Amino acid sequence: MKQDLTWGWAFGCVAALAIQAALMVLVAPWFAGWVHRLAGRLVGEPRFPAGGRWQEIWHQFRRPSLYGRQDGLNGIFCALALVLAVLACGLVPVFTLTMPGFPAPGMLLVCTILVAVGVLLDLPQAVQEASAAQQGCAAIVADALLLPVLTPVLLLTGAHDLVAFLGRLHVLSPITEGAPYVLAGVALFLATALARRDEQTASATLSGPDRAMWLLAADCMQMCWVTLAADVAWAGSLAMPGESGAENWLTQCVEGMGLWMFKLLVASFMLAVLRMALLPAGRRARVRLGAIFLLGVLAWQVTSSHVAAPSAEPENHNVEDENTQGYSTEPAPEGEPS
């Protein structure tokens, strides 16, 4: 039995959102370091341990910044990117949804914030000179086109917010009714899987806290895309507050956290394999945008066909009623022809 939104449940939802945001920010550099190390193992190259990413970020935070003539706005770009990335970490569900009636963002808002983070991360390279600026501008165009390409995926949510949309998918099986949403999740996953920023080039002009904020924002953005894709592909792992008591909800949260770690493990192997593909930046951007759009269109068409199919049944029943309207199923009286 579903419960109404009370002050106790509202406080629990706020605490869950804060824990989820902090968990994603803490795990994001570890996840990026693990993917980097795993990709190196697949190609036979020695890489730093997974915890080396946090060590690099902490080391850069303690270093002084070295500014050039074009580096005056880099600190603002990196700070804004980090703020938006942390905000996105608080908007993407990790192990639980919020109560119905609790304020929740829409899929369009979450994707817009993540695209804005990607554009801000490209700006430090775009303000440089010569070929570095060209690569940065090309990256900005590729990231800016990501939001229109995601239109078919955004159409699946309709007018619902993200929590209501995932709550509707919670009861669907990923193999049968939820298969189109698995395609939508794969499309969201490709948004980060085929991005593959060259960190050494994109952040080459950054140093000190600016570089640390850039690295942390990039890791948080990657974590948000991966988690959002996993939620859309399999929303059944998320806890549903209000359906039972608080104790059962806390148990579901612990289970959801374990399933989230499992989904991250699967995503890390997929990212490591995809990063072995050697494609030029321009071709990789075209493949990325094309694959996301085609998967989104396919998922939207399959979902539309499933929704339109049941609507034809009442018409058939009406036709049968019209055909049988002049006939009576009662037995005829004795002496009268039936």
Descriptions of predicted regions:
Residues 2-338:
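Alpha-helical transmembrane segments of multi-pass membrane proteins predominantly involved
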